[in-house]
Regions:
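Acidic, low-complexity intrinsically disordered tails
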Residues: 228-235
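Nucleic-acid 5′ end/cap handling module spanning
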Residues: 2-48, 109-223
Length: 235
């Protein structure tokens, strides 16, 4: 099954004041579906490719007495759930988002994404901004889960971010080449991305000469391909 994909908005206020929409913290991890079926726990990327989970994560999943299929993100060594697609083999994607989130809170053994309703949405936005988070995701509370591109959810980001193909590495200077968009620094000790891999980069704006302003390396996007990068609009 394809995961739900969101469009982007620059106007958070309209969604903050509309009670038809809830707000969730926007995470900056790898999109992942995690399924428990009996004693078997599996994970897949947004394209349906299998992913290997640490034994600790499998152990957490197996603490649930119920089977489930969760949509979420792998971030900072843990899985964070933000939607549920099935419970004990029963498809729940036709349920409204509000009902699915409530059911997920009962079923999921994993941490849930922070969600806020009504007036609490503004407080969540302020909290995420103060923590230097990425932004918020707004979802229609009465909408079913739709795979592929959907209008039932939008993302609002404090900074812009996009995915780029690594064209070269300058390890001596600690920078990653992003083709015609310039270079970003590799700010921490770790495993360098490979040439040809897709990486996520945060930036302030795109300059008049097509370069990224204040780019910051966020991580490798193993859930994306070069074809995905080719279809995005960078502005």
């Amino acid at each position: 099954m394809k995961v739900a994909l969101l469009s982007e908005t620059s106007n958070a206020k309209a969604f903050l004041v509309d009670d038809a929409w809830c707000a969730q913290e926007k995470l900056n991890g790898e999109r992942m579906l995690v399924e428990k079926a009996g004693a078997v726990v599996t994970a897949h990327s947004r394209q349906g490719e299998p992913r290997t989970l640490p034994a600790t994560v499998e152990a957490v999943a197996l603490t649930s007495e119920l089977d489930f299929l969760l949509d979420g993100e792998w971030i900072a060594g843990q899985f964070v759930a933000f939607d549920i697609l099935s419970i004990n083999g029963a498809d729940v994607t036709a349920l409204p988002q509000s009902a699915r989130f409530a059911a997920m809170a009962e079923v999921s053994p994993f941490r849930l994404v922070r969600q806020a309703l009504r007036k609490d949405k503004s407080a969540l936005l302020a909290s995420v901004r103060a923590e230097k988070g990425e932004g918020l995701v707004f979802k229609l509370r009465d909408a079913a889960y739709m795979d592929g591109r959907t209008e039932a959810g939008v993302k609002f980001k404090f900074w812009k971010s996009a995915s780029f193909i690594v064209t070269d590495l300058d390890i001596a200077k600690g920078t990653v080449g992003l083709g015609g968009f310039g270079r970003c620094s590799f700010p921490f000790a770790g495993v360098w991305p490979k040439v040809g891999e897709v990486v996520e980069v945060r930036y302030l704006l795109l300059t008049k000469n097509g370069k990224l302003s204040q780019p910051a390396f966020l991580g490798v996007r193993s859930d994306l391909t070069a074809a995905d990068v080719a279809t995005q609009v960078i502005a």
